[in-house]
Structures are given as C-alpha cells and as structure tokens.
C-alpha cells in the first residue's frame, strides 16, 4: 500500500469524504514533490475511492510530474483563482464532500473559508494526528536519507571548527559553514544556523552577529541541512584555547545527560522518561534551573516534527523513530553548553546518526 492509498484507507475507516493536504512537508511525503509555494496555493485532494488530484501553480506542474506524481494535476496561472478551479473540479467529478480532513493547525482562516466555500460547506476534521502517525516511523529509504543528511551536519561542524581564529566573528564562521555545505549539494539549511561565542552561547536560540572570538569562550554550533527533502540537526559546543573548572563541570554534566538519554532510548520506553533521565542528571549537578527546554523533538521531513520529546509525553518509543536528544545548560555571564545528536531507534536500542566527536575539545 503506497502513501496515498494509506490515506484513502484511513478516510474510509474514519468515515471522512476526503482530505485536503496543503503543507509543503506533507505534500512532499505524499507526492514526492518538494517545493516552496510561498503565497501561492498548493493542495492535494485525496478521496476514499476516486482518483486524487493535485493543485499547484502552473509553472511548477512539470516539476510535480517529474517528481513522480502520476495522477491529475490542475495547474493555474497567476491571474486565475485556484479555488474556483477546485470547485469546478469537484463538480465535474460529482463529488459531494461532507467531512473534509485538513491540516487545521496550519491552514489560515482566510484559506479555510475559501476551502469551505469551494467544497460546498464541508465540515472540517483534523488530519494532523493521522499524518503525524504515518510519518512517525521511517522506512529504510528515509533512514538512508537521514543518515546522509547527518553526515553533512557533521561536516558543517568540521568546517566551523576549522574556521575559528581569535577575532573572527560569528557571522564570518557561519558564512563559511553554509558556503561549504552548499558546495556539497544540499537543498538548504534546515533552520537558521547558530554560531555563538562566549556569553551568547547561553542563549538557547541566539542570533549570530558581529561578536568576535576570544580566548576562554565557549563556541556553540547548532546547524542542519536539508538533503533530498530530509533534515538533520546537530549541536556541538567547544572551548576556545582554555577552559575554567566551572565551564568544564557544566560541559561534563551535559555530556553525561545526553549519553544517558541515548542509552535509555529503546523500544517500549516512555518518551517522557528520556527527558527525565537527562533532567535528573542536570538537576543533581545543581543546574536544573538552567535547563529551560524539552529534551528534543522528532526529525524527518521537518526539522521539528512529532513527537515532542518532553517529560509530559507518554508515547512509547518504537523501532523506526528518529528524533533529537539535546540537553543544555545555560548560565548567564558564563555561557551555555548544548550537545545534540540525531537518534534512530532500532530493535536493539538507539543509534546516533550524527557522529561528530562530543567529548570535551579545547580548540
């Protein structure tokens, strides 16, 4: 059963007439076509029995076909109203939609209103939970792509460390990393690259700028790539030239927490218990107040996807899941340490896809 058939089967079981899928990530998952439509409408209609159809800007219809979509494509010009074309397509097929599964968390109010009109007042139900479950367990090809993306993330850290010299700015190092990764053929970075020096490393989502590197700084890299539609995400922290005892204690605590959470990752383990494992180590060391975020997040087509690796999550790990483990400690006036790996759950336990060394390195 292919992915479209799987959605059709779910619609039939749930009693929903159809699904309208519009996010670029889920469109890619179901069609193999990856694009950024910006403000233009892109959407996929899937039914219980009828043939699906795909609506997209006409200038991208050929790319969708080349990506492997072998069902109908309704391409539209910029002067045309795609909602009118959708309404005509449904009427032509004599399809009356009563219950329509949509990505309710991401569709705008304006588009929801236009979709409701085009479908003759269909009642909306959520498609997110089901699509998240479909994407949760990665197949062999997805694991292969995630491994390749992880290797390139490792390479990005390698480039970053090689670029370091006293007085260089965060943005100069960032530019070198992204330039070298682009030369490797990536689609793009999976999120805004972070290169943070000194006290700025203590900002969990800091913005690189003109801060320059000096002796005794922590250097934090957080980066990832998109390769053939799949993402990676790695964080490594280094000391530059020297390290004081407090910095070293922080680093070793984070490293111990990260390793323990990876070791605990096995099928059947509650996700929340991974967070609690890492958090317990950090709290015991006296830094509990300085670990302000969850342990990690799901990883795949999106750099942040289901599941959330928080202590409140009762979901049990399954073979084929991929997610990040990224504990951190962030202390004002000292800086921060975060260590992050992409983790694949196998029947025997967890395998880290990112492989860059993570024992303390003084550069």
From Swiss-Prot:
One of its GO terms (molecular function) is metal ion binding. Binds 2 manganese ions per subunit. Mn(2+) 1 binds at residues 233, 297, 326, 340. Mn(2+) 2 binds at residues 222, 233, 340. Its EC number is 3.4.13.-. The keyword Manganese applies. CDD domains: APP-like. Keywords: Dipeptidase, Hydrolase, Manganese, Metal-binding, Metalloprotease, Protease. GO terms for biological process: proteolysis. Its cofactor is Mn(2+). It is an enzyme of class 3 (hydrolase). Belongs to the peptidase M24B family. This is Putative dipeptidase YkvY. It comes from Bacillus subtilis (strain 168).
